[in-house]
UniProtKB/Swiss-Prot annotation:
Protein's GO biological process: cell adhesion
Assigned keywords, A-Z: Cell adhesion, Cell membrane, Disulfide bond, Glycoprotein, GPI-anchor, Immunoglobulin domain, Lipoprotein, Membrane, Repeat, Signal
Family named by the database record: Belongs to the immunoglobulin superfamily. IgLON family.
Organism (species): Bos taurus (Bovine)
Disulfide bonds: 57-115, 157-202, 244-296
SUPFAM superfamilies in the cross-refs: Immunoglobulin
Gene behind the chain: OPCML
InterPro entries in the record: Ig-like_dom, Ig-like_dom_sf, Ig-like_fold, Ig_I-set, Ig_sub, Ig_sub2, IgLON_domain, Immunoglobulin_dom
Keyword Transcription found: no
Domain Ig-like C2-type: from-to ranges: 39-126, 136-219, 223-310
Official protein name in the record: Opioid-binding protein/cell adhesion molecule
Membrane topology (UniProt): Lipid-anchor; GPI-anchor
Length: 345
């Protein structure tokens, strides 16, 4: 906002110097108010970035000259504009008020502004501080992440704003009040569990505007766990269904065995159907030879598990507890059985 650049004639620079010497506060001299009531003290002005700021100076008929300065730079002297900034305009120049406006305010406009007046006796000044508030904005946040259960995870969320925003992390995939909250730019999770997967929300808030909110998804991989495998009783000639339900990330692949034989759709009138985390083995016309123990095997890249399920006829005495266990196995998962054995533990 300087005035003694190449765009101005040398005589204008002389005028500026004269103004500073005659009635404006020289650079380096402390600001003083003259008397306690004139010019009237001004409150600080607070505006949001992009808004307009109005700086008002209350004067009276004792004033012979008046000017607005930003630090040591003259913006206006009377009705004469000295600032080259098109955003700075004069609003009011009357015997009782001298006001300017700064349009589309930005953070570099923040700072002290001085209304300097000349009376018959001596110069007097009044200072106002312009405060520019900036809504919160998240500038950098972690990408979605996939980890194995038991690993450590660190999420980052960096935000800017004026005043400096408060950054809060919250786990969205749990009931309200049950998920942990971290008031920090970094969210650190040690020995992560499968129930800590889901969306995490970063919120940046400074009360200037609505909070800026971004989300990060954490996927936790874990080996299969068979959560449901129920023995089924059915009469000869009826339809029988064995069901096996497994939880796993990535999703488990299923195989069915009877003793050492891997079963497949179409074999002896059976059908295997896999839908998501559930696999079913259907017998459309149960015969005596179909009765017995079947093994459901669920696998993914992290591990393998199995459960024993029994198809039985009327009057059979069956242990009500199904055998579900982790297991080791040598299998061709997408082809024919190469070798098959289980070690339960």
């Amino acid at each position: 906002m300087g005035v003694c650049g190449s765009l101005f004639q040398p005589w204008k620079c002389l005028v500026v110097v004269s103004l500073r010497l005659l009635f404006l506060v020289p650079t380096g001299v402390p600001v003083r108010s003259g008397d306690a009531t004139f010019p009237k003290a001004m409150d600080n002005v607070t505006v949001r970035q992009g808004e307009s700021a109005t700086l008002r100076c209350t004067i009276d008929d004792r004033v012979t000259r008046v000017a607005w300065l930003n630090r040591s730079t003259i913006l206006y002297a009377g009705n004469d504009k000295w600032s080259i900034d098109p955003r700075v305009i004069i609003l009011v120049n009357t015997p009782t008020q001298y006001s300017i406006m700064i349009q589309n305010v930005d953070v570099y406009d923040e700072g002290p502004y001085t209304c300097s007046v000349q009376t018959d006796n001596h110069p007097k000044t009044s200072r106002v501080h312009l405060i520019v508030q900036v809504p919160p904005q998240i500038m950098n946040i972690s990408s979605d992440v996939t980890v194995n259960e038991g690993s450590s995870v660190t999420l980052l969320c960096l935000a800017i704003g004026r005043p400096e925003p408060t950054v809060t992390w919250r786990h969205l995939s749990v009931k309200e009040g049950q998920g942990f909250v971290s008031e920090d730019e970094y969210l650190e999770i040690s020995d992560i569990k499968r129930d800590q997967s889901g969306e995490y929300e970063c919120s940046a808030l400074n009360d200037v505007a609505a909070p800026d909110v971004r989300k990060v998804k954490i996927t936790v991989n874990y080996p299969p766990y068979i959560s449901k495998a129920k023995n089924t009783g059915v009469s000869v000639g009826q339809k029988g269904i064995l069901s096996c339900e497994a939880s796993a990330v990535p999703m488990a692949e299923f195989q069915w065995f009877k003793e050492d034989t891997r079963l497949a759709t179409g074999l002896d009138g059976m059908r295997i159907e896999n839908k998501g985390h559930i696999s079913t083995l259907t017998f459309f016309n149960v015969s005596e030879k179909d009765y017995g123990n079947y093994t459901c095997v669920a696998t993914n890249k992290l591990g393998i598990t199995n459960a024993s399920i029994t198809l039985y006829g009327p009057g059979a005495v069956i242990d009500g507890v199904n055998s579900a266990s982790r297991a080791l196995a040598c299998l061709w998962l997408s082809g024919t059985l190469f070798a098959h054995f289980f070690i339960k533990f």
